[in-house]
Amino acid sequence: MPQTLTEKILSRASGKSVAPGDVVEVKVDIAAFHDLTGYHVIEVMEKAGMLKVFDKQKIVIAFDHLAPPPDVRSAEIQTQIRKFVKELKIPNFHDINVGILHQILLEKYANPGYVIVAADSHTTTSGAVGAFAQGLGASDVAAAVITGKTWVMVPQSFKIMLEGKPGKWINGKDVALKILGDFKADYFNGMSIEIFVREPSAFPMDFRATVSNMGIEMNADALMFVPDEETVNYIKTNRGYEPNIVRPDEGAKYVDEYTIDLGKLEPLVAAPHSVDNVKTVNEVEGLDVDQVFIGSCTNGRISDFEIAAKILKGKRVKSRCIAIPASYDLFKKAMELGYIETLVNAGCIVTYGTCGPCLGGHFGVAGPGETIVSTSSRNFKGRMGSNDSKVYLAGPAVAAASALQGKITDPRRFS
């Protein structure tokens, strides 16, 4: 029987043919955690008396949520994890100077057809290269770290086709918000979303990573882009090898199908306090903005900063603006291309590789009564700081234009 991408990956990982609804044990290709969740993962392992890993090469650890540590407790957590890394001789450890876990997985480790589990909900980001990637709780990740296995209920597969080419200032965030606006945040529960791109070059890896990252906001079990030449080129460019490609079979059965015409999209925002409270930018244009955040594992990549730099070049922001590329490699490339200089000259505060403001942790927490425009993934009440703050989610073009004007602004005003 023809299989979807989801069914193919889980069949390979379980060693038997699977169908939606099956509960199977699968081998994991990567198990990962970061500083904020790593403490709990290690605690579970210690309590079980099983402080060991199934394969040192398949464990990935990164410091990002508490990087650099904003308080003594954060520093203590990182010290404990460094000790764990040293004792177990884990090679794929990335300290506070490397980047956000999900970006690191995308840049260095994830491959088409992989099963990836990590102790963070935005693990779905690795679906951009066609990996079945899920965020799990600390106990399940601890079990995967020890045994190299986890259990999965095989989800139904939902097919989305992207047609055409996106217009100016449109990127992956607008596609993610389009899906959330049309289907709402609970529609895809128990499903895996598989996205096909009719013209692969029209929707590059940066855009795909944003959409996959927000798969968890759609309550999808996974969100994967079907691998194509863009996938191959990305991995070959970043890692120097050509990956094996896994694609669904012709005639595979999907629970439903949906098409998005990229050429018809306009800039979208998610208004407070829900990711599916989606509006066109024109519906909220003119609202005063106190702070703008451009970055995170959702929109902290080169194309995001290219867009922001084009809008901000030679100008000064009117709102506070924080810009955080998702990794050191991205920060360095953005410097080489002049984007960091442009943002700094425009009055932005720039660092790299920290989750900081996204989770209301540090480096730009929202105060009472403040309105934030953010390229991150969530706008729940209190997500970025005060419960009395409001967060509007948007792509980098809306964010940069809003920082420039000090109010929510349609970027199409800038040619």
Swiss-Prot record:
<keyword id="KW-0456">Lyase</keyword>
<dbReference type="GO" id="GO:0051539">
    <property type="term" value="F:4 iron, 4 sulfur cluster binding"/>
</dbReference>
<dbReference type="InterPro" id="IPR033941">
    <property type="entry name" value="IPMI_cat"/>
</dbReference>
<keyword id="KW-0100">Branched-chain amino acid biosynthesis</keyword>
<dbReference type="Pfam" id="PF00330">
    <property type="entry name" value="Aconitase"/>
</dbReference>
<dbReference type="GO" id="GO:0003861">
    <property type="term" value="F:3-isopropylmalate dehydratase activity"/>
</dbReference>
<keyword id="KW-0028">Amino-acid biosynthesis</keyword>
<dbReference type="GO" id="GO:0009098">
    <property type="term" value="P:L-leucine biosynthetic process"/>
</dbReference>
<keyword id="KW-0479">Metal-binding</keyword>
<dbReference type="InterPro" id="IPR006251">
    <property type="entry name" value="Homoacnase/IPMdehydase_lsu"/>
</dbReference>
<dbReference type="InterPro" id="IPR018136">
    <property type="entry name" value="Aconitase_4Fe-4S_BS"/>
</dbReference>
<feature type="binding site">
    <location>
        <position position="358"/>
    </location>
    <ligand>
        <name>[4Fe-4S] cluster</name>
    </ligand>
</feature>
<comment type="similarity">
    <text>Belongs to the aconitase/IPM isomerase family. LeuC type 2 subfamily.</text>
</comment>
<dbReference type="InterPro" id="IPR036008">
    <property type="entry name" value="Aconitase_4Fe-4S_dom"/>
</dbReference>
<keyword id="KW-0004">4Fe-4S</keyword>
<protein>
    <recommendedName>
        <fullName>3-isopropylmalate dehydratase large subunit</fullName>
        <ecNumber>4.2.1.33</ecNumber>
    </recommendedName>
</protein>
<comment type="pathway">
    <text>Amino-acid biosynthesis; L-leucine biosynthesis; L-leucine from 3-methyl-2-oxobutanoate: step 2/4.</text>
</comment>
<comment type="function">
    <text>Catalyzes the isomerization between 2-isopropylmalate and 3-isopropylmalate, via the formation of 2-isopropylmaleate.</text>
</comment>
<comment type="subunit">
    <text>Heterodimer of LeuC and LeuD.</text>
</comment>
<dbReference type="InterPro" id="IPR011826">
    <property type="entry name" value="HAcnase/IPMdehydase_lsu_prok"/>
</dbReference>
<feature type="binding site">
    <location>
        <position position="355"/>
    </location>
    <ligand>
        <name>[4Fe-4S] cluster</name>
    </ligand>
</feature>
<keyword id="KW-0408">Iron</keyword>
<dbReference type="InterPro" id="IPR050067">
    <property type="entry name" value="IPM_dehydratase_rel_enz"/>
</dbReference>
<keyword id="KW-0432">Leucine biosynthesis</keyword>
<dbReference type="InterPro" id="IPR015931">
    <property type="entry name" value="Acnase/IPM_dHydase_lsu_aba_1/3"/>
</dbReference>
<dbReference type="InterPro" id="IPR001030">
    <property type="entry name" value="Acoase/IPM_deHydtase_lsu_aba"/>
</dbReference>
<feature type="binding site">
    <location>
        <position position="297"/>
    </location>
    <ligand>
        <name>[4Fe-4S] cluster</name>
    </ligand>
</feature>
<keyword id="KW-0411">Iron-sulfur</keyword>
<dbReference type="GO" id="GO:0046872">
    <property type="term" value="F:metal ion binding"/>
</dbReference>
